[in-house]
Each structure stands twice: as structure tokens, then as C-alpha cells.
């Protein structure tokens, strides 16, 4: 199982981070060990002093593929959920200054959180999926799939030009504006529409 992630896929988030708007999708990966297993507590990692949440829509790959065309891409994923790409922002900033890869900041154990899956058969319009994140009952991120720079089909097709996609792979499709710091004791809740898909306490 592979975990693909898309960076800078919302204009407002790219701007809040001081990044240029990319000409093509920015792809990075997390290992399988990054996935926080169900019913497993999340602990604040000891190696960072600035842990940030990044709420994202996450796709589940349902069919093996390679070199997928945009117009066929929807056949390769079957469900969506909300998730968190946890980021050690202090480490990431240092790595970016040196032009180094981000794995230490983003790919560590349990840094990828996913909620309950919603089959696309229950989604009225994949280009109009509202989602958000609450921290301690206060909304901190809210966006919609219609604000993505690259939509689901473009992302799947683009990734498949470089990597095979396989059943069970996950794609974190990018975070909108509003990323921020979390500390021990914070409660994070991810939503699609009005449905709570995960609740997590930082321990």
C-alpha cells in the first residue's frame, strides 16, 4: 500500500505558505507505517516543537492502473474521506531552506490520519464536496473540492504517469488554507458535509 500526497493544490494555501502556484501537481509520498491505524492513539512526536494539522480529502484506489487517461481516471477510485497530513513544520522549514526532501517532516509513523470512507456512489457531485476540520469544537479549516487546482481525475492520471496505482493505495489530495499548530490535549474532528468522519485527541 502506498500513500501519495499532493502539495500546493489550493491557491489560498500556497499563498499562506509563501509558495508559488505550481504548473503541475506537486507529489510526495508517505510509507505504509505513516498511516495511523484505527483505534490507535495519536501521540505528539518528540522530535518537533511545531506540529501542524493539514486537513485533506483522501481518495481510495480501487483498481490497479498505469498511464491512466483523465477521462478514465474515475474508474480507479471508489471512496473518499477526510484525513490529516500531520507536518512537523519546524523541521519542514529547515529542510526547505536547504533544498532537501520533506520525509522527516511529513512521512513519520502515524503522520497520516484517515476517517470513515464514503463511497462515491453516495456522493452527488465529486466536484462539490465540502469538508473541514474542527479543533476543540472551533472550525479551523473549511473548503470544497471545487477549489482544487487539480481535481481528482487529473491527480490520479498524473500520478499514474510515474507510479503504478494499486488497490488500497491512498491519495491525500492537498490541504486548503487554515493550517495551524496543535498541541497535546487538542481534539481534532474531520467532516465531509455535516458528517463527522474522525475524532482524534493529541496525546
Identify the role of each PLM range:
Residues 1-166, 170, 178-203:
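Catalytic-core "active-site belt" of small-molecule-metabolizing enzymes
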Amino acid at each position: 500500500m502506498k500513500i501519495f500526497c499532493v502539495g500546493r493544490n489550493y491557491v489560498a494555501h500556497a499563498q499562506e505558505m509563501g509558495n508559488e502556484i505550481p504548473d503541475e501537481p506537486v507529489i510526495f509520498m508517505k510509507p505504509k507505517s505513516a498511516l495511523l491505524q484505527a483505534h490507535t492513539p495519536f501521540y505528539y512526536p518528540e522530535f518537533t516543537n511545531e506540529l501542524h494539522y493539514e486537513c485533506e480529502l483522501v481518495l481510495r484506489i480501487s483498481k490497479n492502473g498505469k498511464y491512466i487517461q483523465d477521462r478514465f481516471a474515475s474508474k480507479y477510485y471508489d471512496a473518499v474521506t477526510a484525513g490529516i497530513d500531520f507536518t512537523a513544520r519546524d523541521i519542514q522549514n529547515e529542510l526547505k531552506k536547504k533544498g532537501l526532501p520533506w520525509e522527516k517532516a511529513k512521512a513519520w509513523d502515524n503522520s497520516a490520519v484517515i476517517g470513515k470512507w464514503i463511497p462515491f456512489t453516495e456522493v452527488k457531485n465529486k466536484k462539490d464536496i465540502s469538508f473541514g476540520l474542527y479543533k476543540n469544537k472551533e472550525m479551523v479549516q473549511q473548503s470544497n473540492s471545487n477549489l482544487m487546482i487539480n481535481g481528482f481525475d487529473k491527480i490520479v492520471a498524473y500520478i499514474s504517469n510515474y507510479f503504478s496505482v494499486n488497490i488500497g493505495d491512498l491519495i491525500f489530495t492537498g490541504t486548503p488554507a487554515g493550517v495551524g499548530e496543535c498541541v497535546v490535549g487538542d481534539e481534532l474532528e474531520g467532516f465531509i458535509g455535516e458528517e463527522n468522519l474522525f475524532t482524534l485527541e493529541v496525546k
